[in-house]
Design a protein with these regions (language model features):
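Hydrophobic structural segments
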Residues: 1-114
Length: 114
């Protein structure tokens, strides 16, 4: 499936346009291949997860916690750089949806609690 159509579908399903999280950078964080056939899911953006996704052949990773955190620019150090390197070298698209996965009554992480 084309990456942009998939992102549009996910954004619509999670109702991303209804309200924006003012503190976190949600949605597309790293741009990868234009075609997506394998998607890895996770909670937090750690190096091991990205390496496993690359080994598995994932074209996209969808996470709860964002790699880039807030919209406030921060310096990229070695830890963040190594994570980005795996994604960029393997052309893996990274999507994150913190607030939207917390609150969605059907698709969210807290769906059983709501």
């Amino acid at each position: 499936m084309h990456r942009d159509k998939l992102i549009e579908f996910i954004n619509k399903a999670l109702e991303v346009k209804i309200d924006k999280d003012p503190w976190l950078f949600n949605g597309l964080q790293v741009l990868g291949k234009s075609e997506v056939s394998k998607i890895a899911l996770g909670v937090s953006p750690n190096l091991e997860l990205f390496e496993q996704a690359a080994t598995w052949g994932a074209d996209m990773v969808i996470l709860h916690h964002g790699l880039l955190g807030s919209k406030i620019a921060k310096p990229i150090g070695k830890v963040l750089g190594n994570r980005l390197k795996v994604l960029l070298n393997h052309e893996i698209t990274l999507l994150t949806y913190h607030h939207f996965l917390d609150r969605h009554p059907v698709l969210g992480h807290n769906a059983q609690l709501i």
